From Swiss-Prot:
Record family assignment: Belongs to the site-specific recombinase resolvase family.
Resolvase/invertase-type recombinase catalytic domain: residues covered: 2-138
Record flagged with keyword Hydrolase: no
Name of the featured protein: Transposon Tn1546 resolvase
Residues in the signal sequence: none
Amino acid sequence: MRKIGYIRVSSTNQNPSRQFQQLNEIGMDIIYEEKVSGATKDREQLQKVLDDLQEDDIIYVTDLTRITRSTQDLFELIDNIRDKKASLKSLKDTWLDLSEDNPYSQFLITVMAGVNQLERDLIRMRQREGIELAKKEGKFKGRLKKYHKNHAGMNYAVKLYKEGNMTVNQICEITNVSRASLYRKLSEVNN
C-alpha cells in the first residue's frame, strides 16, 4: 500500500506549499504536482497517478477541488480508482474516504450521484420544453435538411433515376447522395 499525494494549483504563480505541508504531515510515499486549471480534463500528472495506481494504494488530496471541479468527473474518477481496487481520501472533505468500506461515504456518494443524474435530466427536460415552445412560436424548425428542394446533387440524382440508364449505386456514387436519401426523395416526388 502506497500513500500517493496529488497537488494541483491553477497557475504557475500560485503556491502549492500549503498542500505539500498538509500531505507531508501524514507521510506520503510520492507526491504528484500539477499546475493547471481544475476545469480542464487534460492533466498529465493526474493521468500518471491513475496509470501508476496499484491495488490498495490511497490517493490523498487536501481538498476535492484539487482533483476535480466537476461532480460528474469526480464520479468517473472514483469509478476508475475503485476499478483498480485503490482508494481516494480528501483531508478537508472527510466524508469522502474510500480507503475502507465506510457506509456513510458510500451513502453520500450514491446520493451525490443521484443528484448529479437529476441535474442532467432536468437540463434535458428544460431543453425539450424550450424546443417545444420555440416550435410553437415558429422559431425552431429542427435541423436543416441536408438535401433541400433546390439541392443540385439531389435534383440531378432524381433526374438520372428517372432516365433509367444507371443503377441506384452508380447514381449515388456520381452525385454523392446516399441511397436512403435518394429513395426518400423519390418517395416524396411520387406522392
